[in-house]
Amino acid sequence: MNQNILSRSACNALRGLAIIGIFLHNYCHWLGPIVKENEYQFFQHNADWLLQVMANPDINLPIHLLSFFGHYGVPVFLFLSAYGLVMKYEAKPHLSADQQAQMYNISGRKQSWSISWREPLRFIRYHYLKLFKMMIVGFIAFTMIDYITPGARHYEVLGIVSMLGMFNNVLPNPDNIIWPGPYWFFGLMLQLYIVYRLLLYRRHWGWTAGLMLLCIGIQLLLGFDNPESEAMNRYRYNFMGGMLPFGLGILYARYGEKILMTFHSPVTNIFGCVFCISLIYSLSLNMIGWTFVPFFICLLCVLVADLLQEVSWLSGIYKVLEWIGVISAALFVTHPITRKIFIPISRHGDIYAGLLLYIIASIGIAWLFTQLMKKIPNPKS
C-alpha cells in the first residue's frame, strides 16, 4: 500500500478544480452558438467545430473551451472517489505484513477471503445513504424552482422513483429521464461502489486492470460500430464508461508512482502538464483517442496537485481551490438551480453577465447548503 500520495488538502483542491470545470461546463453547453461536448457519445462534427473555433477565435473562446472540456471534471471525481475508498478501507492495519505483501505487491498472488454477504450489503447501504443525503436537499430545491420558472419539467413517477433510487442510469433513454441532468452522477457512483465492494475490494491488481481493459474494449467496439449510437450513450451513462478513471484511482492509491508518475520538480511538472493538455486536446479529435482521454486527465490532476503543493506563489490559488473542494458536494447539487434562473440572461445576448451572476450565486448558495447539509445526520456504517 502506497502511503500519503495525495494529502487530504490536495484531494480537496483537485475536487475544487473538478467542480469548477463541471459547473461551468453545465452552464456553457446550454448556450446555442457554443461548441458542444463529446461526453457520452463521440460526434465528429463537435470535434470539427472545436477545430474551427480554435482556428478563428473570438470573445467566446473561453466559453467554447469550458463547454467542450469542462465535463472532464467527472473523471477527476471518479479518480478521487476510488482513491478515497482504497485509503479508507484498504489502508487500515487489520492484515498481517505477509498478507499485505501478498495483497498489494503487483507481482504477488491474492489470497482467497471468505466474507459474509451482510458486510457488502452494509457497505452499499451506507454509501447509498451518503449519496442520498447529498442529493435530496438539492433535488427538493431544484424541483420547486423548476416548477415556478419557465420550461418546467413534466416529471413521471418512474423518473422520480428511479432518481431517488439511483437506478435511472440503467433505464432506456436516460437523457429523457434524468432531470436535472448532472444528477446522473449519483447513479454512476452507486454502481461503482457496488463494483468496488463486490469485485475489486482487496483483490489482486489484475481484477482492476482486467475490468478496465474489458470496459475499454467494449467501448471501442461500440465506437467502431457507431460512436453516435444510443448504445454508446447508455454504455457511458453506466459504470463501464467510468471504469478507466475509477480503476486508475484504485491502482494509484495502492501503487502510487508505479501507475502515474510525477517528477517532484516544479519545472518538470509544468512541462508534464503542458504535455498532458496537448495530448488531451489532440486525442479529443478522434474516437479512439477520445476513449483514452480520461487517463491523461487523471495524470494531469496528479501533476497539478504536486505542482500546487511545490510552488509557493501558487499557494493562494491552492487555498481557493481547496475551499471550493470543501463545498464541492453542495455546489454539484445546487448549480442546476442557479443555472435555471440565470441562463436566460446569457441566452438573450449578454453571455458573460449571466455567467458571472451564475458563478457568484452558485458559490454563495453552495456555501449555505454546505452548512445545511452538516445538520443532516450521517448514515451509520
Question: Where are these predicted regions, by residue range?
Answer:
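Alpha-helical transmembrane segments and terminal signal-anchor/GPI-anchor hydrophobic tails
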Residues: 219-330, 337-358
